[in-house]
């Protein structure tokens, strides 16, 4: 494209506009067992995921292992230390983002109440040592656990505690 005038510059940017823009948000929660004060293990995470299926979520499996859920363009995934992450759908505005987040939190709260767990929304788990974080059977996390330390001494901390 040749730019010969101010209008050419304006047209260049106008041509890049998209008609429909969306917002997509991810949020992650640590789940804590109220009885022990520790992060929940994979078996306990399965209880939560199976409970969430009552809200219309469908299973996502890797081999025979339940590793997440999906529903209407949204997904719930298990992170390396059994953190639960909602990858939201395409939202038109911040109000839809809030509604989606609140609905998910309400569902998660119901599951946690049933199993005596609580959610914590913080960026880093300050009370669990990396070696004590429970794991799950996702294949890529096994590979990442062995490979990531080659690139930094805190890589497993980032993976399991954030």
Outline where the language-model segments fall.
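Terminal catalytic/cofactor-binding subdomain
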Residues: 1-152, 161
């Amino acid at each position: 494209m040749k730019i010969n005038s101010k209008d050419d510059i304006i047209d260049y940017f106008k041509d890049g506009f998209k008609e429909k823009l969306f917002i997509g948000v991810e949020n992650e929660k640590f789940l804590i067992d109220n009885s022990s004060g520790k992060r929940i293990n994979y078996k306990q995470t399965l209880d939560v995921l199976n409970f969430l299926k009552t809200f219309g979520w469908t299973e996502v499996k890797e081999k025979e292992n339940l590793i997440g859920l999906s529903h209407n363009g949204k997904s719930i995934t298990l992170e390396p230390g059994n953190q639960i992450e909602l990858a939201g759908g395409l939202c038109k505005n911040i109000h839809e983002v809030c509604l989606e987040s609140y609905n998910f939190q309400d569902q998660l709260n119901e599951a946690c109440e049933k199993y005596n767990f609580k959610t914590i929304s913080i960026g880093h788990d300050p009370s669990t040592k990396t070696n004590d974080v429970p794991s799950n059977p996702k294949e890529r996390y096994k590979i990442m656990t062995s490979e990531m330390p080659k690139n930094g001494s805190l890589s497993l901390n980032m993976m399991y505690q954030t």
